[in-house]
Amino acid sequence: MKLLKPSWVSHNGKPIFSVDIHPDGTKFATGGQGEDSGKVMIWNMAPVLKEEDEKNENVPKMLCQMDNHLACVNCVRWSNNGLYLASGGDDKLVMVWKRAALIGPSTVFGSSNKLANVEQWRCVTILRNHTGDVMDVSWSPHDVWLASCSVDNTIVIWNARKFPEMVTCLRGHTGLVKGLTWDPVGKYIASQADDHSLRVWRTVDWQMEANITKPFSECGGTTHVLRLSWSPDGQYLVSAHAMNNSGPTAQIVERDGWRTNMDFVGHRKAVTVVKFNPKIFKKKQKNGGSPKPSCPYCCCAVGSKDRSLSVWLTSLKRPLVVIHDLFDKSIMDISWTLTGLGMLVCSMDGTVAYLDFSLDELGDPLSEEEKNSIHQNIYGKSLAITNTEPQLSTTIIENPEMLKYQQERRNSTQANSGPGATGSESATPKLNSVMNGESLEDIRKNLLKKQVETRTPDGRRRITPLCIAQLDTGDFSPALFNSAPILPSGSSMSNQLTSQLSSDSSPGQAPPLGLRPSQDPMLISPPPSSAAKVLEDNKDGVKSCLLLTSASKIEPMKALDSRFTERSKATPGATAAIASSTGLTPSERPKESTPMQKDVKSKEDTSSDSEDKMATINKNLAFNKRKPELLMDGAEVVEKRKKGRPRKDKMAASIAQPLTQTTSPAEREPSRAAAAGAGAAAPTAAAALKLPTPSIKKAFTLQVSMDPSVVLEVENEVSVVAGSRLSQLRCSRDGRDWNTLLPSSVLTAAGSSDVVAVASQDRMLSVFSSCGRRLLPAIQLATPASALHCSAHFVMVLTSGATLSVWDVHKQKALVKNESLLTILSGAAVTVSQSMLTQQGVPVVGLSNGKSYCFSLSLETWTLIADTADSLVQCADFRNCLPNQDAPMSSGPLAAMQGRNFNAGRLASRLSSTPHHLQQSMTLAFLENQLASALTLQSAQEYRYWLLIYARFLVNEGSEYRLRELCKELLGPVHKSATTSWEPTTLGLRKRDLLREVLPVVGENLRFQRLFTEYQDQLELLRNK
């Protein structure tokens, strides 16, 4: 054995916490503390291996130095193929580095040109999720996953094929997690923490396999790291700091039953790091000796806080070698060469040591074929994971139905990969022509546009030179992990992912605008009254977008990235249904809003004839959007109009929301006499809310149904009989007309295919059938009607006294009786912006603060169904759970009230750094809220839609408990019982039919095949019965 301590490997006296040798053995990386930041350094291995190379000045020793980490680097690890280097530090970040192929040497910043970076390594992605220092990182055997652990007590598994996607977050440790290691066959990952436990996790479902605590019960959190290691044959897991009879040991955990009967003993202080040699050895045959069968064995190195290093062979009871006082401080990390004969050790004293062994000392290493043969004999076929998804290829599919769903999913994945991607050339972009969605020629042109040109007094041009470095396209190679380069700003978004979501934009829409990677899109949310605008600035030759968004106009958000475009397309029938239930007040729009209306309408989609018709109808309809007035005793309520033209943002707001129709302030202005008549008493606590009432028009026309076509015509004061002024209501239904007379002027009217209702100035409500027959006697309202809606055979009235009532005309029964809106109208600044009545008779009210409520008939209370400012909406992300064949829902009341708000929220969350685990939990809560809201609204179509998305989300996230509970509820009792209260249907949908739709979704994930088989068999049993 040879021992060398290269003095030139140093972090300027600062501690070195990690070391790792490149798989090809030509270089090694160190990580530790820098001057004022974390430091990652890559060194040449040749001067370590050969003395002549160390003395040769032409052979560089340091290859690269990276100071991107803001705090100390605790771990560096090369990927198994050697293309990537991962580093984790106290700045809570995991950085993945790749060599820049086409950039030449450069000097290290701040080194006075003494240190030169021979190789250029740049950070290709930053993984953000941990909330504490990252202590260890580790690549899985086939580079499918990258694991990181932290002092936040969690282990995060990253999808190394799709950085920065997170696969899962393993929770269970109650102390700082300080070490990770992968099972060499990819079935388990083990972690060790300060909570006196070593935990083993399964990779098939990311659940805990074993929790080993006994050997660690006496341990204290005295070590900086706990780097455990798995033997190359997979049979043994050796922990770091353990105790046996109050003495420090390295505990040996057997894979079979996770028994802890053996340990490595001898170190005087706590063991900090254990590292197995990657090779499996057999005894070396002497010259001329006949080969004798011998059991393969492994080699393990153990480092401790006592500054000593021991090397063990599993075929010997005592260590092969022990080196005392190798360093001045604790040993922090160990790394073996891939040949198995060299080892690097680093210490907190800032130095490293290299140990070179011979074959006589360790034995003959087995070839890779022999090593794989051992794995196959013990575990079956080795895990050759080639699928992009974290599914193990060795998992046996036990159910033929499951096999069918797996094949269908594979076929759909191939079909979605693109019709033109038939060959390798079409599937992979050319590296020398495209980078991050822009051609290199475009990038050069954009850079040239940044040149500053001035002219001297004599007229000569002076151009300031602009350095254009050679563009490095090697960084953007999609060969490994299919990973896209990150934005220079640190954001993990990439334009390369743009094509992954199918675009459903109509021909009339503008294509998405391209954003350069160096520019961060800004999302600025002004008050809701402002209209949506897109300001384009062509400075620097690039279109930069400034988004001013309102609650309902989110179209320009496509300009950021087509990944975030999930537009809701209203069907013609849905548009008609919504229009028929809006209860609009007859009035004409103010003249000043007409130009703006035309401008906006030219930008919107008018793809169907019915939508054009509805736009024409809504042109003559209006609904008040003024804030509710607080009528107090003696308080004068006078609204002064400002001189001049109204503000543009207020005009745009009058047409921005599709379900809100506005009128001019003059039409809704209360009379000054009425306001002055209130007196001048001091305001009291018993302030009454008052909603505005429609103004009386001489005549108006209202189309309330498209199929069949129902048109209402109202003409006030058509004649005077015996001093009474009569008004006429005429209804045209499929060419058949009927009319009736009313003793008072009509304020508003509404109708459906079943009933017609009118509210009069004398606070009377009249209800007629579709043929003109009066169905109910005139209903006396407490206050004048503010809004009126009809849907099917239900009638809803919202009065100016802020009360709401709903009647079932067929049953002649009140479903909601004078329910006050006081509980939801909190504050004088909140007003009713829209209202509607569903086909099932459920009233819905939308407020100006972005919240929407419906009155639950069963709970008899107001329930919140939408909130534009809800943080759950801001972070919900279920794009991966949307079925490919379904368009975004647009026909239900829930979608009508929410609009595109949650699309905007998810876009905003992309521009911020929301932790993935938090986004995961909030998405789950959001989907459950959607299910509950659809159930309250009695919207069967939307309930089924969100149920399938919810089930797919649970399957993708591996939430077995919730998924099992959902399936159990849908299945119901298998055997009949007198005590069961299970309802076989919900909203008219058979629950077991819904379960049959959910099961194929469950069948897409192999980890749930037992759950799939269990409920599939029970459904078949019930069907046979």
From Swiss-Prot:
Residues 588-614 have a biased composition (Basic and acidic residues). GO terms for cellular component: chromatin; HIR complex; nucleus. GO terms for molecular function: nucleosome binding. Required for replication-independent chromatin assembly and for the periodic repression of histone gene transcription during the cell cycle. SMART domains: WD40. Residues 408-433, 490-534, 563-614, 634-678 are annotated as: Disordered. It is found in: Nucleus. The keyword Repressor applies. Transmembrane segments: none annotated. The gene is hira. This is Protein HIRA. Keywords: Chromatin regulator, Nucleus, Repeat, Repressor, Transcription, Transcription regulation, WD repeat. WD repeats lie at residues 11-53, 68-107, 129-168, 172-211, 220-263, 266-322, 326-367. PANTHER family: MEMBER OF THE HIR1 FAMILY OF WD-REPEAT PROTEINS (PTHR13831), PROTEIN HIRA (PTHR13831:SF0). InterPro entries: CAF1B_HIR1_beta-prop, HIR1-like, HIRA-like_C, HIRA_B_motif, WD40/YVTN_repeat-like_dom_sf, WD40_repeat_dom_sf, WD40_rpt. One of its GO terms (biological process) is DNA-templated transcription. Residues 412-433, 490-508 have a biased composition (Polar residues). Belongs to the WD repeat HIR1 family. The keyword Transcription regulation applies.
